[in-house]
Amino acid sequence: MYSIKTDHKLMPRERLIRLGPEKLSNQELLAILLRTGNKEKHVLELSAYLLSSLDSLADLKKFSLQELQRLSGIGKVKAIEIKAMLELADRIQIAGQAVADPVLSSAQVAEKMMIELGDKQQEHLVAIYLDSQNKIIEEKTIFIGTVRKSIAEPREILYYACKNMATSLIVVHNHPSGLTKPSANDYHFTEKIKRSCDYLGLICLDHIIVSKHGYYSFREKSDLF
């Protein structure tokens, strides 16, 4: 259970200024984001209440906007601010993981994409375009929804490859189920995109399936490459 601060003489904002953000508790940091409490709860009590409803801090990402609003004291505005904060934190983490050096392995790409796609509740199909030195030119989300619908036509993947004048590409998609074992459709799609790349003189380096818990690389584990 998160403790509730009883000394309100030095509020979280003042403590952050004096001590730095790393010295504040999760309760205090969340209180700064919430800004105000309500008629029933002081802002520190409200942040403690929200945190006490979680098994771990990471569970905060699992709340939908509607679920946050249903929590006592968390209205629409506060729920929106929390979701925006979580999304921004994700983007900062992703930016920090950006691959500036050459891509050297499927495991390197998989680790990056597990962070980006591991928690997604819908399937995302992403293409990573590389230059002749295996440096990333662009990472493009091609499709969100049901990957099967995108399997029929790899033309959009190839369009951006040509637009970026890429030498090679890596295709990644996630399995929200958490299981990374490829389906028959995944095999069919891999064969199709590889043939299409060969036809255009592009190199398809890999097709990687990721989840929160791991990844499957067709290059590492199948005979398609």
Curated annotation (Swiss-Prot):
Belongs to the UPF0758 family. Zn(2+) binds at H173, H175, D186. GO terms for molecular function: metal ion binding; metallopeptidase activity. A motif (JAMM motif) lies at residues 173-186. It holds the Pfam family UPF0758_N. The keyword Oxidoreductase does not apply. InterPro entries: MPN, RadC_JAB, RuvA_2-like, UPF0758, UPF0758_CS, UPF0758_N. One of its GO terms (biological process) is proteolysis. Keywords: Hydrolase, Metal-binding, Metalloprotease, Protease, Zinc. NCBIfam families: PRK00024.1, radc. It comes from Streptococcus equi subsp. zooepidemicus (strain H70). This is UPF0758 protein SZO_09140. The keyword Protease applies. Residues 102-224 form the MPN domain.
